[in-house]
Amino acid sequence: MPLITRNVFIDTEFFVKANLDFGSRTIKSFEELCEKGELHHITTTIVIKEIERKIKEHIKEALKGIKNFRRKAIVLREYEDDNIQNLFKDINDNDIEAKALEAFSNFIENSETSILDMKNVDLNEVIEMHFNEISPFSAKKPNEFRDAFTLLALRAALNEGEKIYVISDDPDHKNFCDENNDFINVDTLSSLNRHAFNRHLRVI
């Protein structure tokens, strides 16, 4: 698959399914390709806020699990083994959350991400899409306003004839890409990374 464009948008759910691990090999490879100018990461203020919210929710759930474990394993505190005692060391919830958010912020900065706001989105068009069940809206998903705003913001940012890859396995995103020639759906980021990396090798 030859690269058609450098522009790449990554759906929020991709990051969630990747466990919000911004140090993973796939995300780090993408970051490196963006730094080299092989790819151009474009996102929106909505996606930024969504991911930050997801990070906070995941941290809260993880810390809850740790506290539940400690409550059930309280008998182990009597053992003087360092490995066991480490399980009961104090955890600063705010520090953990801050570090997780910092990892995301570093990814955005290192990949030289362009962040779009909603100023160029036509609210009337969003309303029409909603009531006419035009992707990303559907009968089963009538409340996809965040996705609609994001996709229309991306469309408004493209120059005439310019295209963008959309990394998502969401059926409604795929339908939107099918209905809009400038949007190219790719199921996985690793697949796009591979083609971009191969292109980079041919160039050098």
Can you describe what each PLM-predicted range is?
Residues 2-162, 171-204:
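Active-site-proximal, substrate-binding regions of enzyme catalytic domains
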Residues 166:
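Conserved nucleotidyltransferase catalytic core and NTase-mimicking acidic/glycine-rich helix/loop elements
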